[in-house]
Amino acid sequence: MSTFKIKVANFFARQSCAAWQPNRIIRAICRQLYRFIMETDAKEYPYADLKFANWPESDGDFYTLVTDSSGFVIRRSTSYVAWLMKKYCGNSPKLPKPWTRKPGEHRFDAKHWGEILEYNGWQKVSRAEWPSYRDIFDERHFIGIITDTDEFGLLVWFNNAGFNITGSPVIWLVSTYKDFKEQNLEIPVSEKSGIIWYREPKVKDI
């Protein structure tokens, strides 16, 4: 994205934050404007450029967090996976109504995403249905939730699986957003990995 577009988007993003703009209506308008600039026609995750919203983050009285069009704080695994859902599955996730937050929960918490995925028709799978390389050929998408990673948990997007000579998967190849950057991880296929897998709904399940 051009430097000019980033500067314009930054202007509106800053004005969408309560720290700099006290008027709620103006904040809402500016929020829609920077999202339009950043997300329209984007082929990859649109908030990866660290020149956008490059100020210190705060969710206290001096609120400076910036969210995507799904309402998730940018450069978190939740925002990243929500973007991949839109890119590969056709729709951004819808939040349950009313959205009841648990004590201490923030918009970028990944560990509570089970209820969001189920609300959008995704199905929690058993060990027998864990993702494998066959799902790549069948174009089945999976999202994994790791609840005990850091304070907020972590979402991962299944990309592929490595397998042994018998054809059994031994490594999950996933992508996620961690430490404010996109990362590709290799995770052992094991219950010890602590991943809770969800599979996108089939057409007949929608």
Task: Kindly label every feature range from the protein language model.
Residues K7, F11-F12, C17, I26-G114:
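N-terminal capping segments
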Residues A9-F11, A28-Q32, Y119, A128, ...:
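Compositionally biased, intrinsically disordered low-complexity segments
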Residues Y45-Y47, E57-G60, E151-I206:
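Aromatic- and glycine-rich peptidoglycan recognition patches
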Residues V81, M85, G144, V156, ...:
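Hydrophobic beta-strand residues in large extracellular and virion-surface proteins
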Residues R101-S175:
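...with weaker cross-activation on analogous glycine-rich loops/strands in unrelated enzymes
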